[in-house]
Regions:
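Extracellular/periplasmic periplasmic-binding protein-like sensory domains
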Residues: 229-304, 360, 364-370
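Immediate post-signal peptide segment of exported/extracytoplasmic ligand-binding proteins
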Residues: 12-25, 54-62, 152-158
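Signal peptide-proximal N-terminal region
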Residues: 19, 39-65, 182-186
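Segments of small-molecule ligand-sensing domains
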Residues: 287-300, 309-366
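Extracytoplasmic ligand/sensor domains, especially the bilobed periplasmic-binding protein
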Residues: 89-192, 240-266
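Beta-alpha junction/loop-to-helix N-cap segments that form part of ligand/metal-binding clefts
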Residues: 14, 33-37, 52-127, 136, ...
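Extracytoplasmic "Venus flytrap"
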Residues: 22-43, 68-74, 96-99, 163-171, ...
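Short, low-complexity disordered leader/linker segments with a strong preference
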Residues: 1-20, 56-57, 86, 370-371
Length: 371
Protein backbone atom coordinates (compact mmCIF):
# COMPACT_ATOMS: atom_id res chain seq x y z
CA UNK A 1 0.00 0.00 0.00
CA UNK A 2 1.01 3.61 -0.47
CA UNK A 3 1.06 4.15 3.30
CA UNK A 4 3.45 1.24 3.82
CA UNK A 5 5.79 2.59 1.14
CA UNK A 6 5.71 6.06 2.71
CA UNK A 7 6.66 4.56 6.09
CA UNK A 8 9.49 2.55 4.54
CA UNK A 9 10.89 5.64 2.80
CA UNK A 10 10.64 7.71 5.96
CA UNK A 11 12.52 4.97 7.77
CA UNK A 12 15.41 5.25 5.31
CA UNK A 13 15.76 9.01 5.52
CA UNK A 14 18.16 9.79 8.37
CA UNK A 15 17.21 12.81 10.45
CA UNK A 16 20.73 14.02 10.18
CA UNK A 17 23.77 12.67 8.43
CA UNK A 18 27.32 12.32 9.63
CA UNK A 19 29.96 13.38 7.14
CA UNK A 20 33.56 12.28 7.60
CA UNK A 21 36.43 14.55 6.59
CA UNK A 22 39.99 13.22 6.77
CA UNK A 23 43.10 15.04 7.92
CA UNK A 24 46.68 13.77 7.58
CA UNK A 25 49.92 15.24 8.89
CA UNK A 26 52.98 14.24 10.92
CA UNK A 27 51.65 13.85 14.47
CA UNK A 28 54.86 12.04 15.48
CA UNK A 29 58.51 12.60 14.58
CA UNK A 30 60.70 15.70 14.36
CA UNK A 31 58.02 18.00 12.89
CA UNK A 32 55.09 16.76 14.99
CA UNK A 33 54.71 20.34 16.30
CA UNK A 34 53.72 21.39 12.76
CA UNK A 35 51.47 18.36 12.19
CA UNK A 36 49.61 19.00 15.45
CA UNK A 37 49.22 22.67 14.54
CA UNK A 38 47.58 21.56 11.27
CA UNK A 39 45.35 19.08 13.08
CA UNK A 40 44.23 21.83 15.49
CA UNK A 41 43.25 24.01 12.52
CA UNK A 42 41.06 21.17 11.24
CA UNK A 43 39.53 20.54 14.68
CA UNK A 44 38.61 24.21 15.08
CA UNK A 45 36.99 24.30 11.62
CA UNK A 46 34.93 21.16 12.32
CA UNK A 47 33.79 22.57 15.68
CA UNK A 48 32.74 25.84 13.99
CA UNK A 49 30.84 23.99 11.26
CA UNK A 50 28.98 21.85 13.76
CA UNK A 51 27.88 24.97 15.65
CA UNK A 52 26.58 26.48 12.41
CA UNK A 53 23.67 24.05 11.99
CA UNK A 54 24.34 23.28 8.32
CA UNK A 55 21.72 21.59 6.14
CA UNK A 56 22.72 19.83 2.94
CA UNK A 57 20.09 18.13 0.76
CA UNK A 58 17.45 18.84 3.40
CA UNK A 59 19.30 17.07 6.21
CA UNK A 60 21.23 18.56 9.12
CA UNK A 61 24.85 17.58 8.72
CA UNK A 62 27.26 16.72 11.52
CA UNK A 63 30.91 16.72 10.50
CA UNK A 64 33.45 14.32 12.00
CA UNK A 65 37.21 14.62 11.67
CA UNK A 66 39.17 11.44 11.04
CA UNK A 67 42.79 12.27 11.73
CA UNK A 68 45.73 10.11 10.64
CA UNK A 69 49.47 10.37 11.34
CA UNK A 70 51.90 10.03 8.41
CA UNK A 71 55.07 10.76 10.44
CA UNK A 72 56.26 12.85 7.43
CA UNK A 73 57.10 9.49 5.83
CA UNK A 74 55.94 8.71 2.25
CA UNK A 75 55.17 5.01 2.98
CA UNK A 76 53.26 5.84 6.14
CA UNK A 77 51.50 8.55 4.13
CA UNK A 78 50.12 6.17 1.51
CA UNK A 79 49.00 3.77 4.26
CA UNK A 80 47.18 6.65 6.01
CA UNK A 81 45.56 7.65 2.70
CA UNK A 82 44.28 4.11 2.12
CA UNK A 83 42.91 4.05 5.67
CA UNK A 84 40.93 7.24 5.03
CA UNK A 85 39.58 5.89 1.73
CA UNK A 86 38.48 2.70 3.54
CA UNK A 87 36.85 4.82 6.26
CA UNK A 88 34.72 6.43 3.52
CA UNK A 89 35.77 10.03 4.09
CA UNK A 90 34.25 12.46 1.57
CA UNK A 91 37.36 14.65 1.39
CA UNK A 92 40.88 14.94 2.79
CA UNK A 93 42.84 17.90 4.09
CA UNK A 94 46.54 17.07 3.82
CA UNK A 95 49.23 16.09 3.76
CA UNK A 96 51.70 18.54 5.25
CA UNK A 97 54.90 17.62 3.37
CA UNK A 98 55.21 17.38 -0.41
CA UNK A 99 56.99 14.02 0.02
CA UNK A 100 53.88 12.48 1.61
CA UNK A 101 51.28 14.51 -0.32
CA UNK A 102 52.41 13.49 -3.80
CA UNK A 103 52.32 9.67 -3.42
CA UNK A 104 49.06 9.84 -1.42
CA UNK A 105 47.40 12.00 -4.08
CA UNK A 106 47.20 9.03 -6.48
CA UNK A 107 45.22 7.02 -3.92
CA UNK A 108 42.71 9.84 -3.43
CA UNK A 109 42.50 10.39 -7.19
CA UNK A 110 41.78 6.69 -7.82
CA UNK A 111 39.04 6.84 -5.16
CA UNK A 112 37.63 10.11 -6.55
CA UNK A 113 38.09 11.87 -3.20
CA UNK A 114 39.01 15.59 -3.24
CA UNK A 115 42.26 16.47 -1.47
CA UNK A 116 43.30 19.96 -0.41
CA UNK A 117 46.85 20.32 0.86
CA UNK A 118 47.34 23.28 3.19
CA UNK A 119 51.10 23.26 2.81
CA UNK A 120 52.58 21.00 0.09
CA UNK A 121 54.46 23.37 -2.19
CA UNK A 122 56.30 21.12 -4.68
CA UNK A 123 55.00 22.06 -8.17
CA UNK A 124 54.71 18.36 -9.18
CA UNK A 125 51.75 17.84 -6.83
CA UNK A 126 49.31 19.60 -9.16
CA UNK A 127 51.06 18.60 -12.40
CA UNK A 128 49.94 14.97 -12.35
CA UNK A 129 46.66 15.61 -14.14
CA UNK A 130 44.48 14.57 -11.18
CA UNK A 131 41.11 16.32 -10.93
CA UNK A 132 41.06 15.79 -7.15
CA UNK A 133 44.22 17.70 -6.13
CA UNK A 134 44.11 21.25 -4.76
CA UNK A 135 46.34 23.44 -2.59
CA UNK A 136 45.76 26.71 -0.75
CA UNK A 137 49.41 27.86 -0.82
CA UNK A 138 51.67 29.26 -3.53
CA UNK A 139 54.04 26.62 -4.91
CA UNK A 140 57.85 26.44 -4.71
CA UNK A 141 58.35 27.94 -8.15
CA UNK A 142 56.95 31.18 -6.74
CA UNK A 143 58.46 30.85 -3.27
CA UNK A 144 61.97 29.71 -4.21
CA UNK A 145 62.16 32.15 -7.10
CA UNK A 146 61.24 35.13 -4.93
CA UNK A 147 63.79 34.13 -2.26
CA UNK A 148 66.52 33.65 -4.88
CA UNK A 149 65.98 37.13 -6.28
CA UNK A 150 65.81 38.58 -2.75
CA UNK A 151 69.18 36.99 -1.87
CA UNK A 152 70.85 38.74 -4.80
CA UNK A 153 68.96 42.04 -5.05
CA UNK A 154 68.17 42.88 -1.42
CA UNK A 155 70.72 40.95 0.66
CA UNK A 156 73.39 41.67 -1.99
CA UNK A 157 74.58 38.06 -1.89
CA UNK A 158 77.66 37.66 -4.09
CA UNK A 159 78.45 34.02 -3.29
CA UNK A 160 75.58 31.79 -2.28
CA UNK A 161 75.70 28.24 -0.92
CA UNK A 162 72.70 25.90 -1.07
CA UNK A 163 71.90 22.88 1.11
CA UNK A 164 68.84 20.66 0.82
CA UNK A 165 67.47 17.66 2.73
CA UNK A 166 66.72 15.56 -0.41
CA UNK A 167 62.97 15.44 0.30
CA UNK A 168 60.45 16.40 -2.40
CA UNK A 169 59.93 19.69 -0.57
CA UNK A 170 63.53 20.51 0.35
CA UNK A 171 65.08 19.64 -2.98
CA UNK A 172 62.21 21.29 -4.87
CA UNK A 173 62.41 24.61 -3.04
CA UNK A 174 66.24 24.63 -3.27
CA UNK A 175 66.11 24.00 -7.05
CA UNK A 176 63.69 26.89 -7.51
CA UNK A 177 65.85 29.12 -5.27
CA UNK A 178 68.89 28.38 -7.47
CA UNK A 179 66.86 29.33 -10.57
CA UNK A 180 65.84 32.59 -8.86
CA UNK A 181 69.46 33.40 -7.93
CA UNK A 182 70.66 32.74 -11.47
CA UNK A 183 67.79 34.74 -13.01
CA UNK A 184 68.87 37.71 -10.86
CA UNK A 185 72.47 37.34 -12.05
CA UNK A 186 73.73 35.78 -8.80
CA UNK A 187 76.18 32.94 -8.32
CA UNK A 188 75.73 29.64 -6.46
CA UNK A 189 79.21 28.65 -5.28
CA UNK A 190 78.34 25.35 -3.58
CA UNK A 191 75.49 22.85 -3.38
CA UNK A 192 75.41 20.31 -0.54
CA UNK A 193 72.94 17.68 0.65
CA UNK A 194 71.78 16.27 3.96
CA UNK A 195 68.68 14.35 5.11
CA UNK A 196 65.57 15.31 7.04
CA UNK A 197 66.76 13.12 9.96
CA UNK A 198 70.36 14.40 10.17
CA UNK A 199 71.74 16.16 13.26
CA UNK A 200 75.42 16.61 12.33
CA UNK A 201 76.22 19.05 9.52
CA UNK A 202 79.88 19.71 10.33
CA UNK A 203 81.34 18.11 7.18
CA UNK A 204 79.03 19.88 4.69
CA UNK A 205 79.35 23.17 6.57
CA UNK A 206 83.15 22.89 6.60
CA UNK A 207 83.08 22.37 2.81
CA UNK A 208 80.82 25.41 2.47
CA UNK A 209 83.00 27.57 4.75
CA UNK A 210 85.92 27.12 2.33
CA UNK A 211 83.84 28.88 -0.36
CA UNK A 212 83.25 31.93 1.90
CA UNK A 213 79.55 32.38 1.12
CA UNK A 214 77.66 35.46 2.28
CA UNK A 215 74.29 33.66 2.05
CA UNK A 216 73.46 30.03 2.91
CA UNK A 217 70.07 28.73 1.75
CA UNK A 218 68.57 25.60 3.31
CA UNK A 219 65.75 23.64 1.67
CA UNK A 220 64.14 21.70 4.51
CA UNK A 221 62.30 21.99 7.80
CA UNK A 222 62.90 23.84 11.09
CA UNK A 223 63.91 20.64 12.98
CA UNK A 224 67.05 20.46 10.81
CA UNK A 225 67.46 24.20 10.11
CA UNK A 226 67.78 25.16 13.79
CA UNK A 227 70.66 22.81 14.66
CA UNK A 228 72.31 23.68 11.32
CA UNK A 229 72.34 27.37 12.29
CA UNK A 230 73.93 26.53 15.64
CA UNK A 231 76.66 24.51 13.92
CA UNK A 232 77.27 27.38 11.47
CA UNK A 233 77.95 29.51 14.54
CA UNK A 234 80.38 26.94 15.94
CA UNK A 235 82.27 27.07 12.64
CA UNK A 236 82.10 30.88 12.63
CA UNK A 237 80.22 31.02 9.31
CA UNK A 238 78.72 34.50 9.52
CA UNK A 239 76.56 34.22 6.42
CA UNK A 240 72.90 35.19 6.26
CA UNK A 241 70.69 32.09 6.49
CA UNK A 242 67.70 31.68 4.20
CA UNK A 243 64.97 29.10 3.79
CA UNK A 244 61.44 28.49 2.63
CA UNK A 245 58.29 28.09 4.68
CA UNK A 246 59.64 24.90 6.28
CA UNK A 247 62.00 26.86 8.54
CA UNK A 248 59.81 29.95 8.83
CA UNK A 249 58.25 28.95 12.16
CA UNK A 250 57.93 30.02 15.77
CA UNK A 251 59.71 26.82 16.75
CA UNK A 252 62.89 27.91 14.93
CA UNK A 253 63.41 30.50 17.69
CA UNK A 254 63.85 27.68 20.24
CA UNK A 255 65.70 25.35 17.88
CA UNK A 256 68.32 27.90 16.76
CA UNK A 257 68.57 29.70 20.11
CA UNK A 258 71.35 32.34 20.10
CA UNK A 259 72.38 31.42 16.54
CA UNK A 260 69.15 33.04 15.33
CA UNK A 261 70.80 36.45 15.58
CA UNK A 262 69.17 39.71 14.48
CA UNK A 263 68.20 40.06 10.81
CA UNK A 264 70.34 37.03 10.07
CA UNK A 265 67.61 34.58 9.08
CA UNK A 266 65.34 35.36 6.13
CA UNK A 267 62.49 33.12 5.06
CA UNK A 268 59.19 33.24 3.22
CA UNK A 269 55.81 31.75 3.83
CA UNK A 270 53.30 31.12 1.11
CA UNK A 271 50.30 33.31 1.69
CA UNK A 272 50.40 36.86 2.79
CA UNK A 273 47.79 38.73 4.59
CA UNK A 274 47.25 42.15 3.11
CA UNK A 275 44.95 45.03 3.96
CA UNK A 276 41.52 43.90 5.10
CA UNK A 277 42.72 40.37 5.88
CA UNK A 278 45.21 41.48 8.54
CA UNK A 279 42.44 42.01 11.08
CA UNK A 280 40.82 38.70 10.10
CA UNK A 281 44.08 36.82 10.64
CA UNK A 282 44.80 38.57 13.95
CA UNK A 283 41.30 37.69 15.20
CA UNK A 284 41.76 34.09 14.06
CA UNK A 285 45.10 33.79 15.89
CA UNK A 286 43.56 35.12 19.08
CA UNK A 287 40.58 32.77 18.89
CA UNK A 288 42.82 29.82 17.97
CA UNK A 289 44.90 30.41 21.09
CA UNK A 290 41.79 30.62 23.26
CA UNK A 291 40.10 27.52 21.80
CA UNK A 292 43.12 25.30 21.10
CA UNK A 293 45.41 26.40 23.95
CA UNK A 294 48.41 27.06 21.68
CA UNK A 295 49.70 29.73 19.33
CA UNK A 296 49.35 29.29 15.58
CA UNK A 297 52.65 27.69 14.56
CA UNK A 298 52.51 27.85 10.77
CA UNK A 299 49.78 26.30 8.66
CA UNK A 300 46.73 25.97 10.93
CA UNK A 301 44.93 28.96 9.30
CA UNK A 302 45.43 27.31 5.88
CA UNK A 303 44.00 24.04 7.18
CA UNK A 304 41.05 25.89 8.69
CA UNK A 305 40.32 27.57 5.35
CA UNK A 306 40.79 24.31 3.43
CA UNK A 307 38.08 22.62 5.53
CA UNK A 308 35.77 25.61 5.07
CA UNK A 309 36.33 25.70 1.29
CA UNK A 310 35.54 21.99 1.01
CA UNK A 311 32.28 22.34 2.94
CA UNK A 312 31.36 25.49 0.99
CA UNK A 313 31.59 23.38 -2.20
CA UNK A 314 29.28 20.76 -0.61
CA UNK A 315 26.77 23.49 0.25
CA UNK A 316 26.89 24.87 -3.30
CA UNK A 317 26.40 21.38 -4.76
CA UNK A 318 23.75 20.59 -2.12
CA UNK A 319 25.53 17.26 -1.73
CA UNK A 320 28.32 15.67 0.29
CA UNK A 321 28.98 13.18 -2.52
CA UNK A 322 32.54 13.79 -3.80
CA UNK A 323 31.43 13.28 -7.42
CA UNK A 324 28.84 16.02 -7.05
CA UNK A 325 30.73 18.60 -5.02
CA UNK A 326 34.12 18.25 -6.79
CA UNK A 327 33.03 20.40 -9.79
CA UNK A 328 31.89 23.11 -7.33
CA UNK A 329 35.23 22.95 -5.50
CA UNK A 330 37.10 23.47 -8.78
CA UNK A 331 35.24 26.75 -9.44
CA UNK A 332 34.84 27.97 -5.85
CA UNK A 333 35.42 31.58 -4.83
CA UNK A 334 35.76 31.81 -1.09
CA UNK A 335 36.82 34.55 1.26
CA UNK A 336 39.09 32.89 3.82
CA UNK A 337 41.17 33.87 6.82
CA UNK A 338 44.26 33.73 4.58
CA UNK A 339 42.60 35.80 1.84
CA UNK A 340 40.51 35.07 -1.25
CA UNK A 341 40.63 31.43 -2.38
CA UNK A 342 40.03 30.26 -5.95
CA UNK A 343 41.79 27.52 -7.92
CA UNK A 344 43.22 27.40 -11.44
CA UNK A 345 42.61 24.42 -13.74
CA UNK A 346 45.46 22.47 -12.09
CA UNK A 347 44.18 23.03 -8.55
CA UNK A 348 46.81 25.64 -7.62
CA UNK A 349 45.59 28.67 -5.69
CA UNK A 350 45.12 31.69 -7.94
CA UNK A 351 47.16 34.80 -7.23
CA UNK A 352 49.00 33.29 -4.28
CA UNK A 353 50.90 35.85 -2.23
CA UNK A 354 54.08 35.40 -0.19
CA UNK A 355 55.32 37.04 2.97
CA UNK A 356 59.01 37.57 3.67
CA UNK A 357 60.13 37.36 7.28
CA UNK A 358 63.22 37.89 9.37
CA UNK A 359 63.89 37.28 13.07
CA UNK A 360 64.81 40.05 15.51
CA UNK A 361 65.20 39.92 19.29
CA UNK A 362 63.84 36.37 19.36
CA UNK A 363 60.69 37.27 17.41
CA UNK A 364 59.59 36.67 13.84
CA UNK A 365 58.98 39.92 11.97
CA UNK A 366 57.20 40.37 8.63
CA UNK A 367 59.28 42.35 6.12
CA UNK A 368 56.90 42.56 3.19
CA UNK A 369 54.10 40.86 1.31
CA UNK A 370 54.84 40.04 -2.32
CA UNK A 371 51.96 39.49 -4.73
Amino acid sequence: SAAAIAVAVAGCAPKDSTVKIGHVGPLTGSIAHLGKDNESGAKLAIADLNKADIKIDGKKVTFTLISEDDGADPKQGTAAAQKLVDAKVVGVIGHLNSGTTIPASKIYSDAGIPQISPSATNPKYTQQGFKTTFRVVANDATLGGVLGKYAVNELKGKSIAVIDDRTAYGQGVADEFVKGVEAAGGKVVDRQFTTDKATDFMSILTAIRAKKPDVVFFGGMDAVGGPMLRQMDQLKINAKFMGGDGICTGELIKLADKALGNSRVFCAEAGGVVGPYEKKMADFKERFKKEMGADVNLYSPYVYDAVMVMVEAMKKANSTDPKKYLPELAKIQYDGVIGPIAFDDKGDIKGGTLTLFTYKDGKREALKVIQ
